[in-house]
């Protein structure tokens, strides 16, 4: 169902964000271009995570009506 699918996506997004943050903390960006790429990926994943959370809230409200 939709809830299982979106929970899976949230889990994967959070896992990837942690991997990227660990890479940054450990100095894994070879240069500024790679740093920007990593930050961009984190921002994109964060955006998607917020959209999925918003979808959950809208679906819960729709289920209650």
Where are the model-predicted features located?
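Short intrinsically disordered terminal tails
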Residues: 1, 59-65
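N-terminal acidic leader/helix
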Residues: 1-27
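Short, charge-rich amphipathic interface segments used for partner binding and complex assembly
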Residues: 29-60
């Amino acid at each position: 169902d939709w809830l299982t699918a979106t929970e899976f996506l949230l889990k994967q997004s959070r896992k990837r964000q942690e991997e990227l943050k660990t890479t940054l903390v450990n100095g894994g960006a070879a240069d500024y271009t790679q740093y920007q790429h990593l930050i961009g990926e984190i921002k994109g994943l964060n955006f998607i995570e917020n959209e999925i959370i918003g979808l959950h809230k809208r679906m819960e409200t729709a289920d209650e009506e």
